[in-house]
Swiss-Prot record:
It is found in: Cell membrane. It holds the Pfam family ATP-synt_F. Signal peptide: none annotated. This is A-type ATP synthase subunit F. It comes from Methanosphaera stadtmanae (strain ATCC 43021 / DSM 3091 / JCM 11832 / MCB-3). It comes from the Archaea.
Length: 106
């Protein structure tokens, strides 16, 4: 499935992204389901995996393991229906720095 985009999130977020045109949606209901689904998406070679900030925080070690210093898969974290979470570091800034080598200034 190279070069495909997938959304892995709570059912409401998955529905919203699929209505917006994402064809591969994977609703998850708990951390264990999310962990298993993330591994499957990486194994299936999805290029971009969209997930929520909440799931990203829960699976931070797994995300770091799968992305490492590679450009793909790109795992993008978005707010869920409850809004954005306060974080010490911004995963998007970390992603940009890792992929293109430039640190974004706030």
């Amino acid at each position: 499935m190279k070069n495909d985009i997938a959304i892995m999130a709570d059912p409401d977020t998955v529905t919203g992204f699929m209505l917006g045109g994402i064809k591969s949606g994977f609703p998850v209901h708990n951390k264990e389901e999310a962990k298993t689904t993330l591994k499957q998406l990486v194994d299936d070679e999805y290029s971009i995996i969209i997930t929520t900030e909440k799931i990203g925080d829960e699976l931070r070690d797994d995300i770091t393991k799968y992305t490492g210093s590679k450009a793909l898969p790109m795992i993008i974290e978005v707010p869920d229906k409850s809004g954005s979470h306060k974080r010490e570091t911004d995963p998007m800034n970390d992603l940009i720095k890792r992929v293109i080598g430039v640190e974004m200034v706030k």
